[in-house]
Amino acid sequence: MEESMEEEEMLTYEAMMDDQNHNNWEAAADSFRQPPPAPPLPPPPPPRPSSSIPDPGRELPGGQLLAVHAGSMERKGPKEGLPMGPPPLPEPNGVIMMLKSCDAAAAVAKTAPAPTSSSTININTSTSKFLMNVITIEDYKSTYWPKLDGAIDQLLTQSPGDYIPISYEQIYSCVYKCVCQQHSEQMYSDLIKKITSHLERVSKELQASPPDLYIERFNIALGQYMGALQSIVPLFIYMNKFYIETKLNRDLKDDLIKLFTEHVAEKHIYSLMPLLLEAQSTPFQVTPSTMANIVKGLYTLRPEWVQMAPTLFSKFIPNILPPAVESELSEYAAQDQKLQRELIQNGFTRGDQSRKRAGDELAYNSPSACASSRGYR
């Protein structure tokens, strides 16, 4: 009896479970068959208040679209226009499409505000600042050129190796500003006049020199001027690059060397050359370094002057004379012998040509020297 009752209870329990599962399956199937309920529609937007908040979807003057949901404007916090409530419900399709058309852009462009007076004021301010930096011709003559004039004076009159208390950076900056302000032509003209006046004064001083000091003073003037060019040319490099080379098709260094040639060398070459030839015939009347500096300097100024004294120039500059030929060897030997005789006549003796010094033979032949030499062996 008990077993039969237990079996009936088990069957009843299984039947109840089958009915419950069947009901669940039918409910699930019905849910798949029926479409989902539509989401609730958002509440209608309230009337727009009269404030500075732009309309949703309205294009700003900058060309950007501002999309603001109406629900986000219903509640306002401490500051106007800040959304404080919950986020709005999404649209049925989940996407907000914003298209910008040409007509809308044109309409916004027409309604854009005109440029205010502040922009005009800014432009005028920048223009006035630029005009304040303009260097007029009066500024150039009263401020900039006096600085350059004083520096050029010091460079032209300095001795080799002297220290000049001038600011190369300041002079370089003055030249740069004058070139940028279109004063290159005036500055080049002033530079040429300045150096020409200096060279004319140097030429007059050389003319008043006595013959025994003429060569030495010419050497000092030549070396001083060439040394000054090594500083003047770099200081005026902007003028040389943007005016002399571009418009005049010349070079500043060549122009300044030409000035010395025209105002000093050409006026004194016919007085200087006889003195150089005379000094050459008398050994050590002029130091070799002075003679070499003058001869090389004259060749740099004008190579055609070699024809005035080719033998003199050939002693300091290579490849001046034509190459030697075998038929002239006897003549070369005669010239060397003549030079040796002249040296002997001026007190230069040949002396002992052996390799031993005076007293060496006596020292080596003495017994002490022999004993010491054996000791080192």
UniProtKB/Swiss-Prot annotation:
Residue ranges with Acidic residues bias: 1-11
| Pro residues composition-biased segments | 34-49
One GO BP on record is: ubiquitin-dependent protein catabolic process
Q: Which organism is it from?
A: Mus musculus (Mouse)
The UniProt function text for this chain reads: Cell cycle associated protein capable of promoting cell proliferation through the activation of CDK2 at the G1/S phase transition.
Designated name of the protein: CDK2-associated and cullin domain-containing protein 1
Q: Which Pfam families match?
A: Cullin
Subunit structure as annotated in this protein's UniProt entry: Interacts with CDK2.
Q: Which GO terms describe its molecular function?
A: protein kinase binding; ubiquitin protein ligase binding
Name the Gene3D superfamilies for this protein.
Cullin Repeats (1.20.1310.10)
Give me the ranges of the annotated region Disordered: 1-63, 347-377
Say which family it is in: Belongs to the cullin family.
What does the UniProt keyword field contain? Answer: Cell cycle
